[in-house]
């Protein structure tokens, strides 16, 4: 009895000599389930259960409507599959025929060689050469069709007038064509049709009158007696600078509104003569500092919805363009004023504001605010560049494609205040500190900067940055974005008289006066005489066809170069271009 009690008690009490669970588990016998059930799995016979013979499976009965619908769906699926198969077959056949047509000489040569056991005889070799020569002749015929015949009685390039090429006369012209009814005329400035839906060109004639003209040369005077010198287009409005330093606001799409702003007055010296006065101008009286002698505008440029101008004291001002109605626009920083950022309300139209952060600066550690003199400004669609008298470059506005020479990022997509970007050019001039920027230009989404090295007046370097999808960068590459300035392949020639369109650029070499162009050429607006869609590096333009010239001599035409005279200029709007004589 005592032994049993001791045994039970010992079982309840914890053992002092504790054994680990791992060791205890290792001593227990181990079994594999495969061994336990292997006999049944490997040797057990499988017997399927059979349905009793007296039990028959009954398919569910369907109504006539269900049977009809299923039949219709089946036929519909078959019709779709048949249509897809026919479409694929047509594409394969058309693609095969097109490939065979384009590569017919190669296919013909391959077939002749195969039929001759892999050998080429003299007859087959001559046949291949004949096919190649036939293709060359066909290509030459196509080029001849694109070259216009200039009548012998027409005036040549030595006589003043206007030549136009690109998208004109409702078709594409690859070579400059002289515009009738404009022979013998010179102009102060020409602005080609500013948009696709408004196919009217504008010009400022010798007297400073604003006229409109179409591609056939039919002219119409819009605003006489204003002594205009230059003009820009923005937000369906025309902005023109006169010799007094005033900017006129001209709603070119609403002639009645123009007429309401015109009044007549008599001349003080010649009372029997009357002159027209135009009253709608950008108001500078309240914002210019007349006490310091700030009285007139000396230069201006415009983007899609903004305008930037320079006064005679080198101060920059900006305004929104268009009509007086509130625009459904969001600022992209193109005004250079932080209070007009993408988060703020769009500024009122045609009201000038000073760009104080561009006109003034303060050195770090100083309390004195200094004045900065701006020498030139240039506007893209939604961005602006500026250079001061020391050669520093400033940029503000839209930077999606790197057109501000700033890194492309979410925080720098819209820059609403002027930022110095001179440092972006330092890697191109290692060890040099006194190089400076001397010129700037912009097209819609690309910027161009001219840098002059120290101690030389002829050693210039040309850079581009921004959108280069159409070859605007001019370095033989196509890029959607480029924030680091890259050199334009200008062959060390000094370039002048720039004209930037939507996605193409014209310029002129200073010594030889050769016209070079690059960028988009989908309408032949570069004037190179070929249907090349894009040109990613500067190319020479063939000279203007002479009256009665033999157009069958293709080598003499395409190997020639257009040289401009001192008074000749080339301008473009991105779709077409023109050459004119400047007053």
Curated annotation (Swiss-Prot):
Q: Per the entry, what span does the transit peptide take up?
A: 1-25
Its localization reads: Mitochondrion membrane
Q: Where are the RCC1 repeats?
A: 332-389, 390-452, 459-510, 512-569
Its main localization is mitochondrion
Membrane topology label:
Single-pass membrane protein
Task: List the InterPro entries hit by this protein, alphabetically.
Answer: MitoProcess-Associated, RCC1/BLIP-II, Reg_chr_condens
Task: Choose any GO biological process term that the UniProt entry carries and state it.
Answer: mitochondrial respiratory chain complex III assembly
Q: Which cellular component, as a GO term, is one annotated location?
A: mitochondrion
Residues crossing the lipid bilayer are: 83-105
Keyword Mitochondrion annotated: yes
Q: Which UniProt keywords apply?
A: Membrane, Mitochondrion, Repeat, Transit peptide, Transmembrane, Transmembrane helix
Asked if the Swiss-Prot or TrEMBL record annotates the protein with the keyword Transmembrane, the reply is yes
Q: What is this protein called?
A: Protein FMP25, mitochondrial
């Amino acid at each position: 009895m005592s032994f049993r009690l001791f045994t039970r008690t010992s079982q309840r009490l914890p053992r002092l000599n504790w054994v680990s669970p791992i060791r205890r588990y290792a001593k227990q016998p181990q079994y594999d389930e495969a061994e336990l059930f292997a006999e049944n799995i490997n040797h057990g016979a499988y017997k399927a259960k059979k349905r009793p013979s007296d039990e028959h499976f009954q398919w569910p009965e369907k109504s006539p409507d269900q049977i009809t619908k299923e039949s219709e769906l089946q036929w519909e699926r078959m019709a779709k599959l048949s249509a897809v198969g026919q479409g694929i077959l047509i594409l394969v056949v058309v693609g095969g025929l097109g490939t065979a047509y384009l590569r017919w000489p190669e296919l013909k040569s391959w077939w002749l060689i195969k039929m001759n056991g892999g050998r080429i005889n003299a007859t087959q070799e001559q046949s291949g050469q004949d096919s190649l020569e036939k293709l060359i002749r066909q290509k030459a015929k196509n080029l001849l069709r694109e070259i216009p015949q200039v009548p012998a009685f027409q005036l040549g390039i030595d006589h003043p007038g206007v030549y136009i090429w690109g998208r004109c006369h409702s078709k594409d012209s690859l070579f400059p064509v002289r515009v009738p009814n404009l022979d013998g005329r010179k102009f102060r400035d020409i602005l080609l049709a500013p948009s696709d839906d408004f196919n009217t060109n504008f010009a400022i004639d010798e007297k400073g009158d604003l006229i409109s003209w179409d591609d056939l040369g039919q002219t119409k005077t819009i605003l006489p007696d204003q002594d205009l010198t230059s003009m820009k287009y923005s937000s369906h409005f025309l902005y023109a600078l006169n010799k007094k330093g005033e900017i006129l606001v001209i709603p070119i799409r609403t002639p009645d509104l123009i007429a309401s702003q015109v009044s007549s007055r008599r001349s003080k010296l010649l009372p029997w003569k009357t002159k027209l006065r135009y009253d709608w101008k950008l108001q500078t009286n309240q914002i210019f500092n007349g006490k310091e002698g700030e009285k007139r505008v000396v230069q201006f440029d415009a983007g899609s919805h903004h305008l930037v101008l320079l006064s005679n004291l080198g101060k920059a001002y900006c305004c929104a363009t268009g009509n007086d109605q509130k625009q459904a626009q969001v600022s992209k920083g193109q005004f250079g004023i932080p209070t007009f950022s993408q988060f703020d309300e769009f500024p009122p139209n045609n009201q000038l504001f000073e760009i104080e952060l561009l006109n003034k600066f303060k050195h770090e550690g100083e309390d004195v605010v200094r004045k900065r003199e701006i020498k030139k400004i240039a506007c893209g669609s939604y961005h602006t560049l500026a250079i001061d008298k020391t050669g520093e470059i400033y940029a503000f506005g839209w930077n999606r494609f790197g057109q501000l020479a700033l890194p492309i990022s979410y925080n720098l997509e819209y820059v609403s205040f002027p930022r110095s970007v001179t440092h972006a050019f330092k890697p191109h001039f290692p060890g040099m500190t006194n190089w400076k920027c001397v010129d700037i230009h912009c097209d819609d989404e690309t910027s161009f900067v001219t840098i002059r090295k120290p101690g030389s007046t002829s050693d210039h370097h040309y850079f581009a940055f921004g959108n280069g999808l159409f070859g605007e960068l001019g370095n033989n590459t196509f890029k959607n974005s480029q924030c680091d300035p890259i050199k334009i392949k200008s062959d060390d020639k000094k370039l002048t008289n720039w004209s930037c369109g939507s996605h193409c650029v014209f310029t002129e070499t200073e010594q030889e006066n050769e016209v070079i162009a690059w960028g988009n050429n989908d309408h032949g607006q570069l004037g190179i005489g070929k249907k090349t869609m894009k040109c990613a590096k500067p190319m020479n333009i063939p000279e203007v066809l002479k009256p009665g010239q033999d157009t069958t001599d293709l080598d003499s035409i395409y190997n020639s170069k257009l040289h401009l005279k001192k008074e000749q200029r080339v301008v473009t709007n991105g779709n077409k271009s023109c050459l004119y004589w400047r007053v």
